[in-house]
Amino acid sequence: IKGTPRFAKVEDELMVLQHHAPIYETLEGSKSVDPDIAWLGEKLRAWQVTTVYPVAMQLLKPGVSADDRKLLCRLIYSYLVRRALCGLPAKNLNKVFQSIAQVFATGPTTPMALKEFFAARPGTSSKFPSDAEFTLGILSQPAYTLAQGNRIKDVLWELELASRSKFAEAGPMPGNLWVEHVLPDSWNADWPFDDGEIIQRFSGDPRATNR
């Protein structure tokens, strides 16, 4: 009820704050009470998304297994990346994560609960892009403008990690990396095709694909 105090006593509120403080510090990178929460915090800092925090705070509550926590962290990260690279709006994400936090607060905190949440919300403002939609977004959207700065660097680093074999040396992302977009957006005038005809890349013309 609006206006009703959430806690009967100040002591109760302080206990909740004390419980969540280490998790918050882990998300902010100043402490590490769990490796998966620390990993998620690093990703959220790169993507500058703090609206996930109410959800992340619940991933260490009693009853959440380590496997479920790890998968939930990966799913949250995947959700952010997929939406960004598909060109979907981010303005409603605060409401989305508030709703997820409410689902986890009143029910099981599991990957299945998260899957059911998104299955019931296929709209553009909240949908979890499918593999097919994500692939289309990667192939048709300018990722370097949709995920600028640290975001595209983070995506490329994850691709680098995924391409390594299990024998590759593990290590954190170097701090001095940067991304250079060396291909021009409009290049036909300076580098014309041999036949002189200009075909738009996403026009559907098979000759554009062949080139």
What label would you give each PLM region?
Residues 154-176:
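Short cysteine-rich loop/turn motifs with clustered Cys
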Residues 59, 88, 92, 168, ...:
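Generic alpha-helix signal with a bias toward terminal, lower-confidence helices
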